[in-house]
Every structure is written in structure tokens, then in C-alpha cells.
Amino acid sequence: MENPLCVSIFLFYCILIQSSAHGQSLGPESFGRRSRAAETNKTPQETRTKFLLFRGETDKGCQILLNHSDTLQQCGFNSSLPLVMIVHGWLVDDILEDWVWEMVAALKSQLAQSVNVGLAEWVTLAHNHYTTAVRNTRLVGQEIAALLQWLQESVQFSPSHVHLIGYSLGAHVSGFAGSYMSRKHKIGRITGLDAAGPLFEKASLSDRLSPDDANFVDAIHTFTWEHMGLSVGMKQPIAHYDFYPNGGSYQPGCHFLELYKHFAKHGLNAITRTVKCAHERSVHLFIDSLLHADMQSMAYLCRDMDRFSQGLCLSCKKGRCNTLGYHTRQERQSKKSKSLFLVTRAQSPFKVYHYQFKIRFINQTENPVEPTFTVSFLGTRGERQKIPITLSKGITSNETYSFLITLDVDIGELIMIKFKWENRMVWSNVWNTVQTIIPWGRGSLHSGLALKSIRVKVGETQQRMTFCSENMNDLLLHPAREKTFVRCEANSETLKRKIR
């Protein structure tokens, strides 16, 4: 995102938001605080929010009217099943975005027999200047709370059986709805999908989605890149579990370089599509968790993406990992939010497999070595060739280097690793020439860089393995040459037989 083009486009997006305010103050204090005691006792007879229920084969929602019990029966509401309700966000146009119907379809196809699928449609309130839509979030939250309170009173439906899924501004709407419920009757779960950042970042707990708004709150952050104090999505933790796919700042396949492709297809709408790509990725990650229940993306507790990229955070001990999306394990082990990181693919299915590599190099030279390596894997179910390895610094001494490698397919249990020094041929020729001049001693040419073993930890299975050089009499690495490492454990022969 350091590209000047990226900065310019993002600034343009921010200017659109700011200009829509017509001079209004851009700060959370300008929207007032929640008045829970004053507002929760008000039960509106009519709402500006439409509550739709989706049952059967039809895609057209059936509207439930507050205080009209007959509509519950007409729409097929089943009080013995949980309610999963979608809450959309700010709208540039006065129609619902396509992702809403995609999520409805995914929920119906995967969970139709076990949940009520609903939608809180607040188009007339969301299709406004951004700051006006922000002001309306409290009203919509109150109306959702009124619906849930009415369901509790009329058909004894407990709010603890409710799961609100809010995208962008809808995440904060869901939070407000939860705050208007009494402590004894809290909403069961709220999922925030890239909760809107402008006017909410760094706001108090009462002015945004927070862990207090439901028995369990999870959030997925996908577009938190910040410039001039603004970001489309919120960066700060706002839930019991906060997931940061690819670090949360941007998403694969959503680079601003894609803008040129979008311009050719969508014209000026390309800017909106490019920005929305990362913001809306949170939605598609959630939908993916429904459609590919057998390929759940695992995330890991970590301090930041830099440490995660070094492979230092692939532990599942004491609740340090969790699945992303609908099937997230609902735990509240402490009041402190847990930030979890993971890598994803650029398209569905988004799941990748995380591997921590620890390699101890022995540098026999006095000068730092900055080689480029590739690694190839052979597993019981497949193989992957020439995956590049990036070291954070040059190899200066006898030091252990840790880094993360991800695969987009399951190759099964690792059997063999091929490690290659991918220096260009010119460098290889120079290196060999130097070695013919410098007397390293008898035997084969020496590179001054040795590698004895590779330690691997698989995030998804928590399995640990050690790989040793196939030829323990030759541990030296050479430019443009490949070295094979095999499992050191006693069961390595059994593993080899699995692929025959």
C-alpha cells in the first residue's frame, strides 16, 4: 500500500466521506452517547427498519411486523430454533448489495433446518450521507432490540438464541442493539464484519461495538489500513476474539493495482469496487466458512502480523487458536480481547495451511550471506514445488531463523523437503571461481554455509517434525544446487510407504 497511487485513491475515498458531512464535526462526541435507561423503555409501535424472514425455497423475505403476532406465523418463524439475523451497513445506492443475498443463500442452504434466517433491512436510513447514517445506527439498534424484546414477551423466545451478523456500520448497529437489552437477557452472539472505522475508531465502549454487547462477540478485520487518521474498517480490538486475516490491513487480490482492470470493466465505479474489495472480504470469508465447513480457516493468537509472519504464533494451547467465521469456538476466558492472525487465499475457498519453519544455519565465513532460497514439499497426499523463502535479515552467524510458509492445498503429512539456494547463475559462477582460488581444503567446494536440520510445526494439526540432511556427510549448501532433507523420526519409512 506504499504505492503513491494507493495513497491517492484512498485519500479520494476519505474525501468523499468527509465532504458528505457538510461541515459536521467528525468525532464520536458529536453523536452523543447511548442513553440506555431512557431509550430501552420506549417500545415503538412501528419501525423504519424492516425485519424479513427467509423460509422455504423463495428468496423473497417475509416481513415480520413488530407487535403483530400473526406475521410470525405467516412468515414461518420457529421459536424453537435460533435466529440468525443479517444487518447490512452504509449504502451508496438505495438497494441492498449482492453480498446480502449471497449470505442469505449460504445460511439457508447450510442451516435452513436448524435456524431462522432473518435480515434487518434499514435501507432508507442507511442510504444517506455517511454521518447521517452513523446517527441512524442507534435508532436501528434500538428497533432491533425492540423486536427481540417483543419476541421474548410474545413467544418466549430468548435473546440468547440470537446471532446478529453486522457488516461495516451494521456491526455497530448490532452492538447498539445488544446494549439496549437488559443484562439478564443479553443477545447470544454478535459477529462484526469489518466494523466501520470512520467516527468509531478509538471511540468509547458505549459508542461502538464492544465485548459487552453480547454473551459472545467476534470480529473480522479486513481493511484497517490507515491514512490521515482514517481507515475504512476498525483496527482496534472490539470483540472477545478479533480476527485479522493477512494482518487486516489489506487482502490478497484487492491490491490497488487491480484498479486498472476494474476501470476497464466498471468505469468510475472502479474506485468503489477496489476499496470495497478488502472491506467486503470480511463478508466473503464468513460466507466461505458456511459453504466450506470441511475447510475451516484456523487463526492464531499473536501480538502482530510481523511476529506471525515469522511463524512464532502457531500455538493452540490454552485457547490460543480458533476457527474463523460461523463455526468460531465461543469462549470468554477473560475480559481482554484476543487478537488472532491468519493467512488466506485470494479467492474461495480461502483456507491455507500454516507451517512454522525453524532453520539453524552455520555461517563459516566472516561476512554476512544474503541468499535466496526456495523449498519444495513432498507429502502423503501431494507436493508443492519451489516456494520462495524470505529471511528478515542476512545470515551472519550460527543463528536459528524462524519463518512462516503457507500452502493453499492439503498435501498431507510431510515426508520430504527439498531446499535450494536459488542464486542467479552469474553469482554461482563467481562463487565457484572464488572457491577455486581460495584453498578451502580437500573434498568438494565449500560455500561457507551449512544446514544440518529443519524443524517444522504444522499449525492446523499442531504436529512437530524434524528433517535431517539425506547425506549427513555433506551439510554444505551450494548456489543453484538442491539439497534433500528427510524425516529424522523412526517412522519415516512408514510414511514413505504411504505414497507408494
From Swiss-Prot:
Which key words are in the record? Glycoprotein, HDL, Heparin-binding, Hydrolase, Lipid degradation, Lipid metabolism, Secreted, Signal
SMART domains noted in UniProt: LH2
Kindly list the places in or outside the cell where this protein is found, as annotated in its UniProt entry. Answer: Secreted
Record-linked Pfam families: Lipase, PLAT
EC class of the enzyme, as a word = hydrolase
Q: Identify the glycosylated residues.
A: 67, 78, 363, 398
The record's listing under InterPro entries reads: AB_hydrolase_fold, Lipase, Lipase_hep, Lipase_LIPH, Lipase_N, PLAT/LH2_dom, PLAT/LH2_dom_sf, TAG_lipase
Q: Where is the PLAT domain?
A: 353-487
Subunit and partners? Homodimer.
Q: Function, please?
A: Catalyzes the hydrolysis of triglycerides and phospholipids present in circulating plasma lipoproteins, including chylomicrons, intermediate density lipoproteins (IDL), low density lipoproteins (LDL) of large size and high density lipoproteins (HDL), releasing free fatty acids (FFA) and smaller lipoprotein particles. Also exhibits lysophospholipase activity. Can hydrolyze both neutral lipid and phospholipid substrates but shows a greater binding affinity for neutral lipid substrates than phospholipid substrates.
The protein here is known as: Hepatic triacylglycerol lipase
Q: State the organism named in the record.
A: Bos taurus
